[in-house]
Amino acid sequence: MEIMEKLKLLKNNIANIISLLIIPNSLVSFYFIIQEEVFLAFLFIIICFFLDTLDGYIARKMKIVSNMGQAIDLFCDLIVYLMFPIFFIFNYLNFNLFVTFFICSIVLISGIIKLARFSKEGFVVINNEKYYRGLVVPFVLLTTAVFYILHINNFIYINILFPLAIILISILMVSNLKFKKISNFAWYILAILLLWMIY
């Protein structure tokens, strides 16, 4: 009976365990930013992204969605999609310290508001289609990766275009515009493509 209870406890927390695996992997990614190993930094943060999508999938399939799980997921999203890009920006896309402080503050505030709002409201469902109210926070990470690739390929006016892009994303995250949910498969392909381009 004791074994069965432990197995049941494990089953009920499997999604949370997967979510918590994001923490050590994200710490490794931060370490590689400091060590100037950009490819490895993005490799580990993409592993975090895969874990983030996996925990949600398992929670829904096993019907073990809980308030605790949602809270853990919220904090993990904050680390992966907001704190990692901000730390990366300060190290690799910092063209002007004042501007960097400004855009990172704006995107962090907007991202936290977006996460809190989604935690409270969830999806907007229209004609059985799922929509997000406001742009999703992974676009902060995506934009940071894209502009880093442009930067290392000597794309001009990055110092102007990148801050403008971050400000635009910040506005879109807290807007009431509706964005259709992108499939995980599409995100996976995009993540692999970006990783290849960074390599």
Predicted feature residues:
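C-terminal membrane-associated helical module and adjoining short loops/tails
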Residues: 1-3, 128-199
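Topogenic membrane-insertion module of multi-pass membrane proteins
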Residues: 1-53, 172-198
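C-terminal ends of transmembrane helices
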Residues: 5, 56-65, 112-126, 171-181
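Membrane-water interface of alpha-helical transmembrane segments
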Residues: 5, 9-19, 35-39, 70, ...
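Multi-pass membrane catalytic core of lipid/isoprenoid biosynthesis enzymes
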Residues: 10-20, 27, 61-118, 140
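Hydrophobic alpha-helical transmembrane segments of polytopic
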Residues: 18-21, 41-48, 103-106, 110, ...
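Helix-coil boundary and interhelical linker segments in multi-pass alpha-helical membrane proteins
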Residues: 28-43, 79-104, 145-161, 198-199
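Short glycine/serine/threonine-biased micro-segments
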Residues: 46, 54, 67, 109, ...
